[in-house]
Amino acid sequence: VIEATVWHKLMKRSEAKSRAVELFTFLGLPDPQHFGERYPHQVSGGQLQRAMTAMALCASPDLVVFDEPTTALDVTTQIEVLIAIKKAIATTGTAALYISHDLAVVAQIADDIMVLRHGKMVEQGSVRKIFDAPREDYTRELVAVRQKEIESRVEASTSLLTITNISAAYNPATPVLTDITLDLAKGQTLAIVGESGSGKSTLARVVSGPLQPTAGEIRFDGTVLPASLERRSKETLRNIQMISQLPDLALNPRRTIADIISRPLQFYFGMPRDARRKAVAELIDLTELPKNLLERYPAELSGGQKQRVCIARALAARPKLLLCDEPTSALDPLVAESILELLRRVQSETKTSYLFITHDLAIVRTIADKIAVMHQGSVVRYGLKLDVLSPPYDDYTAKLLASVPQMKPGWLDDIILKREERTIADTNKDMKA
């Protein structure tokens, strides 16, 4: 935190340390006197972002550039970081350039907004002006994208995936999943939501096979699913495919797009070359990718195109179940919505089931039929989307829903004000006691 300040001789080391402790305290970091003694791997993602805010503010700059500081954070962590950033900007008088693809977040932080597209300014104005009366079609699309929601479908009678009393751990002393029971019907979507560390991705690892459960049973399409990946048949492996959060890590940079998509066709079905070419062309059409991308490499594609390639490759195996692990978290809203629309259309045409993992409750509203809310390795709320997202709520689900940024300027200010009022009330109560 103090490295740049001391390096540029803006403060003495002792002064910089004192300033860092002040900022740690102000930004709500735990044990501020000793927080600076920790290493980055010893703190959470939200604490790291607040520490980086302290680093940026340490030398009292005139301008701080925030480049997507909350994109990878879950909603409850995100709101704490946003509150810290907003307070820091207001208290220090520092100007801020806040870069984000999430308009709901921008609505809480910014005074003015500039909308960019393809390197050019589309529109600029005050927050109220952009949200209440956007002039350009692109801006209107950005504002409207979070307002879409689909109705839950009537629950199908046939189960594809049944998870019964599953527990799992990475070592005997650290249980990660405890007594998970869920059911996913054929052709439907079960969304798994929760904070980082709640066990969402671990559950996906258990279903897909790399992590064996310590207790419980999983049934897939009517038969018991072997816990070990090595014991699963080739047919079972084909029927359970995954779309990862980071397509750059999932795609081989040395293979062309045609090679990447055709690989499952050769591996699972032994298709000859001509048949593979025809099947790849059909998958390209299904995922709405330009045909001229087939001979290109992943580095030559946009983020949305890479994710579509991942979807095409997964669909090449003709699976019954797709595990979607945060597939849109790194994409801007319009690209993310296009991916979600693609997944909805593919599901309608192929009747593929989705286990959809996300921390974004706005996405859940647009994709899910059923929802399971996870907290500290357990399911705390589970059912049809309408039931889970309607009151009465358990405390944790209420916290998650209350932390989703709203497309309403001033929403975060209201939360800060309520917290301050609650703090004052608690202080007065303690003094009377």
Predicted features by range, described:
Residues 121-125, 133, 379-383:
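ABC ATPase "signature
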Residues 15-34, 275-292, 402:
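Conserved ABC ATPase "signature" region
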Residues 30-36, 127-164, 173, 385-433:
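Short catalytic/signature loops enriched in Gly
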Residues 216-225, 236, 381:
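Conserved ABC transporter NBD signature motif
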Residues 208:
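Helix-to-loop junction immediately C-terminal to a conserved catalytic motif
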Residues 38-43, 47, 297-301, 305:
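Conserved ABC ATPase signature
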Residues 60, 318:
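Conserved catalytic motifs of ABC-family nucleotide-binding domains
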